[in-house]
Amino acid sequence: MSSSFYVQDLLIKKLANDCFVSAQIELPMIEEISKSGINLIVSNRPEGESLDQPTDLELSNQSKLYSVEFKSVPFSGSSLTREKIDNFSQILKESSGGNLLYCKSGFRSAIIWGLSEVLN
């Protein structure tokens, strides 16, 4: 994985060596995501933020089918705390690489990633 890439019509942007960010992923995308070298998916989207988003359980179960780990560190607006940043940072530290972070647009995920880089 050397640069940004597409899975179906979803742009997955490179943040750092083994870290990528995107908008909301869908269940059928996970197989192709796994084939691109992603080993960990981290959701930063709260459950039920949108009626059409898959649940964390659905995403976790689908990810397991392709040997991809799924974690969730949800937040919105002012609910981002130092504890969540530290939890997020620990998840990435324990990862074997190939990390995909997502939320509704990718913006929140980029923010928490940046803060974790600066603070940890």
Regions found by a protein language model. Name each.
Residues 103:
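Short cysteine clusters
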